Amino acid sequence: MGRSLKKGPFADAHLLKKIDAQKDSEKKTVIKTWSRRSTIFPSFIGYTIAVYDGRKHVPVYVQEDMVGHKLGEFVPTRTFRGHGGDDKKTR
């Protein structure tokens, strides 16, 4: 279920402040955030945002086709190690 259109998209205020601060400075650095729930706005394009996955910050370079999605969609939180296999090799 999506968010109501009358509410509009959501992004944490501290993340928007960090993006605006980057626009004023000439040097682009990686922006760290814990806000996986924030929607990617068009103003985020071209920035690298390090999104927390529960263990470490994973850098995500924001491109045009990512607009409208959430930051957490691009950083998986679980590591798939494969299904249990046959133990015939060990016997």
From Swiss-Prot:
Pfam families: Ribosomal_S19
One cellular-component annotation, GO: cytoplasm
Organism: Levilactobacillus brevis (strain ATCC 367 / BCRC 12310 / CIP 105137 / JCM 1170 / LMG 11437 / NCIMB 947 / NCTC 947) (Lactobacillus brevis)
BP terms from Gene Ontology: ribosomal small subunit assembly; translation
Role this protein plays: Protein S19 forms a complex with S13 that binds strongly to the 16S ribosomal RNA.
Keywords: Ribonucleoprotein, Ribosomal protein, RNA-binding, rRNA-binding
GO molecular function: rRNA binding; structural constituent of ribosome
Entry protein name: Small ribosomal subunit protein uS19
